[in-house]
Every structure is written in C-alpha cells, then in structure tokens.
UniProtKB/Swiss-Prot annotation:
Protein name stated in the entry: Transmembrane protease serine 11F
Organism: Homo sapiens
Entries under Pfam families matching the protein: SEA (PF01390), Trypsin (PF00089)
A GO biological process held by the record: establishment of skin barrier
Role this protein plays: Probable serine protease.
Length: 438
C-alpha cells in the first residue's frame, strides 16, 4: 500500500517551518552554551593550575665577597655612621643593577648589607639577597642561576665597585636565619615587601581619621603607660633595652616603677610588655619653652627582636632634611581635638617645614629653636595630637628607617599655619650616646 503524501495548508506549512527553525536554533544555542561552559571550566582549571604551579615564595641567600678598589674606614664598623650607610647604599644599588637587568631580573627583590669588614685587598662585604621563585624550585637550582647572572654581569657591566670574582660565596639560608641577620641592623621593617606605605596623596588626617597601621608596620613604636592610668605617651625603640621619648611625658611622674612599656599595633592586647628600670630626662629641659624635650627610658629586661618588635635607626648628626621631605608620624593619640586615645596604632605622612617658615610671625613667631623640627602642612590637614607625644617622626632612606623627630608640641591639632613641632634628634646624638653608649 502506498501512502499518499501529506498535504499542508499554507498556514500549517508556515507553522511547521517555524518549528523546524526553532528546533535548529535551540540546538545551536545548546551547543554554544555547552562550549561556553567547557571554556569557563578550562579557564578556571588553568588559573588554578597556574597558581598551584606558579606559587612563588621568597628565597634568601647570604653572599660574601671582596671589593678591591676601596679602602676600609674605621666607621664602617658603626652601622649608624654616615660612612657605613653611604657605602651600604652604594653596594645595594650595585646589586640591584647587577640582578634587575639580568636573566634573574624579574625574580630579584632586594638586598641588605649586613657587615663591612677590613681585608688586605680592600673590604669584605656580607650581604643578604632576597629573590622570589616558584615554590617548586630548589634553593640550589636558584643559587646556580644567581651565580650565573652575577658572573655574566661582571663580564659585561661597568660597575662602580670592583668585585673579586673568586671571593664570591653564596649560601642559601632560611627565613629565621635571614631575620636574625637583619635584626643586627636597625630600621628594617620585616613586612615592608608585603605592606605598602600610606599613599603620598592621602588626605587622611592624623586627627579626624588617620590611617590605621598594621601589625609590624612600625615595629619600633612603643606605648608608655602609667600603671592604673593607661597610655600616656609614645616612644621609639632604639636598642633592645632603650626607648627614646619626650621629657614632658614625665613632668607629673618620674618614678620608673609606676611605668610600663608595651609594643605592637594595639595597646590592648599588647604584643610585648616590659617594666621600666630607669627614666632619664634631659638636664636642660624647660617645660615653659619646650626646649630639650627629650628623654630616655631603660627597660627592666631587653626585648627580643621579631617581625613585630624592631629598633629604629638613630640618624648621623650631620643628616639634614630639606623642606618638603616626606616623613611619617605614628601614635595612639586622639583623632579629634581633645578626643580619646586610640587602641590601634595610626600613621600619617607629613612633610618637613623649614625653621624660617615655622618662625614666621603668623606661624610660631620665633619660638622654634635649633633643637626643634617642624613637620606637617601649612594648610593644617595632618598633624599629631594629644597622646602622640614622645612618639617617632621617621624618615625612609633606601628602606632603612631613621628617627628624625620626637612628637613634642604644637598649637591645638591640625590648625592652619600651626604645624607639629618635634624634637630634632640629630641635635641630641651626643647626649643620647653619653647616656646609652649608642
């Protein structure tokens, strides 16, 4: 039996054609959707694989070598001396030049000179080198890459210092050894490679909401507290037993048994706590004029340096900061005039202001003496405030931090033409040395 062909009316034919096309495009859309899902899964797997495989970590090396075209100077043995600082910076710049434009360029992070020693041929250098490589790489494999890059640079680059190639030694070290070596130097923030500084364009005020500091960001900051009364002043750790602060912090109570010092980014709970053994005020401190507003506090027992607790460098007495130099002030003080003490450490970038400007009649009218330093902004947007007294004003020089000022006085907080006034630390280096031996 033959089947007769099915006949459609014009309307039925249009409907059937529409359904056929709809089924076709549904299939296309399903195929495209499936491909998209597969692609997304593939990309996700690729990203995960990338981060698993390319999970970088820090590798640390202790390098030693001889430099033969310079002579050893006695002050190279004093890490806070201008000679040690300048020579160290020259060596660190040279390391950067050697490695950043080499086969390991993208992997080099930074270097820190640990020691300069005398040698018959010149000067022995001991330096920590820090690199970032995939965690799957071995320290020995990386060592060979570093040595190859160095030797190639010695052949092709004109360097300011002559490295004796046979003397070069490179030893992998772990993070604990690296920290111990860096602890022998002052002014180093262990977390600085992971922690950005407050932006220089920040409009945050030290009063009215200045930026909160992270743990370990300012590891020399201390809180001086009267037992039973809480936080009174800030201070700066300059050795494992000595704090530098302001004399006016003790005008009501100079009894060391009534004071404690704590460290860390919060007052409560503190990371480290110490009793006070001795308080030394400058013999010529004048409360009426704020002259010689400087004091030393000796801890009953020394602190152990760590990522959270470190000492800041004392500047050479010859260091001069030009106007508009960026410096940082930190403390637990009020964020509004006459406001409460803050439990969390805060930070702000300010700029140095010349003594001539600060002594203008419309500013402080001649009250700024050679032992004082002005910092802030003439428009008054950032300033230290109540509770910040005694705390540090610090300056960054090639990732080494120096205390250049001690929060001392000012007219109210953050008023226009009334910047903060700090004790100028460079003027008191001899006094500090006479009391501490530093």
């Amino acid at each position: 039996m033959m089947y007769a062909p099915v006949e459609f009316s014009e309307a039925e034919f249009s409907r059937a054609e529409y359904q056929r096309k709809q089924q076709f495009w549904d299939s296309v859309r399903l195929a495209l959707f499936t491909l998209a899902i597969v692609a997304i899964i593939g990309i996700a797997i690729g990203i995960v694989t990338h981060f698993v495989v390319e999970d970088d970590k820090s590798f640390y090396y202790l390098a030693s070598f001889k430099v033969t075209n310079i002579k050893y100077k006695e002050n190279y043995g004093i890490r806070s001396s201008r000679e040690f600082i300048e020579r160290s910076h020259q060596i660190e710049r040279m390391m950067s030049r050697i490695f950043r434009h080499s086969s390991v360029g993208g992997r080099f992070i930074k270097s820190h000179v640990i020691k300069l020693s005398p040698d018959e041929q010149g000067v022995d250098i001991l330096i920590v080198l820090i690199f970032r490589y995939p965690s799957t790489d071995s320290a020995e494999q990386i060592k060979k890459k570093i040595e190859k890059a160095l030797y190639q640079s010695l052949k092709t680059k004109q360097l300011s210092l002559t490295i004796n190639k046979p003397s070069f030694r490179l030893t992998p070290i772990d993070s604990k050894k690296m920290r111990n070596l860096l602890n022998s130097r002052c002014g180093i923030r262990m977390t600085s490679s992971n922690m950005p500084l407050p932006a220089s364009s920040s409009t945050q005020r030290i009063v009215q909401g200045r930026e909160t500091a992270m743990e370990g960001e300012w590891p020399w900051q201390a809180s001086l507290q009267l037992i039973g009364s809480g936080h009174q002043c800030g201070a700066s750790l300059i050795s494992n037993t000595w704090l530098l602060t302001a004399a006016h912090c003790f005008w009501k109570n100079k009894d060391p048994t009534q004071w404690i010092a704590t460290f860390g980014a919060t007052i409560t709970p503190p990371a480290v706590k110490r009793n006070v053994r001795k308080i030394i005020l400058h013999e010529n401190y004048h409360r009426e004029t704020n002259e010689n507003d400087i004091a030393l506090v000796q801890l009953s027992t020394g602190v152990e340096f760590s990522n959270i607790v470190q000492r800041v460098c004392l500047p050479d007495s010859s260091i001069k900061l030009p106007p508009k130099t960026s410096v940082f002030v930190t403390g637990f003080g009020s964020i509004v005039d006459d406001g409460p003490i803050q439990n969390t450490l805060r930070q702000a970038r300010v700029e140095t202001i010349s003594t001539d400007v600060c002594n203008r009649k419309d500013v402080y009218d001649g009250l700024i003496t050679p032992g004082m330093l002005c910092a802030g902004f003439m428009e008054g947007k950032i300033d230290a405030c109540k509770g910040d007294s005694g705390g540090p004003l610090v300056y960054d020089n090639h990732d080494i931090w120096y205390i250049v000022g001690i929060v001392s006085w000012g007219q109210s907080c953050a008023l226009p033409k009334k910047p903060g006034v700090y004790t100028r630390v460079t003027k008191y280096r001899d006094w500090i040395a006479s009391k501490t031996g530093m």
